[in-house]
């Protein structure tokens, strides 16, 4: 019976009211990162691409793949 009382006393002393606060405890402990590091990481991202830049590369690659597939079919 004393084990239960000790566990209960520890729970009450922790200030937590249930599992709802468990996530908050984890987020607070992991938020110790440096904001300067975050700024440097965000500055390194390249988000200024011209519109359709990737689409043009993909479509030309897909077109060459389709052309090779059609050539293989015609040879067979």
From Swiss-Prot:
It holds the Pfam family PKI. GO terms for cellular component: cytoplasm; nucleus. The record marks 16, 19-20 as: Important for inhibition. InterPro entries: cAMP_dep_PKI (IPR004171). One of its GO terms (biological process) is negative regulation of cAMP/PKA signal transduction. Present at high levels in skeletal muscle and brain but is present at lower levels in heart, testis and liver. Residues 49-76 are annotated as: Disordered. The modification N-acetylthreonine is found at residue 2. Keywords: Acetylation, Protein kinase inhibitor. The keyword Acetylation applies. GO terms for molecular function: cAMP-dependent protein kinase inhibitor activity; protein kinase A catalytic subunit binding. The inhibitory site contains regions very similar to the hinge regions (sites that directly interact with the enzyme active site) and 'pseudosubstrate site' of the regulatory chains; but, unlike these chains, PKI does not contain cAMP-binding sites. The arginine residues within the inhibitory site are essential for inhibition and recognition of the enzyme active site. Extremely potent competitive inhibitor of cAMP-dependent protein kinase activity, this protein interacts with the catalytic subunit of the enzyme after the cAMP-induced dissociation of its regulatory chains. Belongs to the PKI family. This is cAMP-dependent protein kinase inhibitor alpha. It comes from Mus musculus (Mouse). The gene is Pkia.
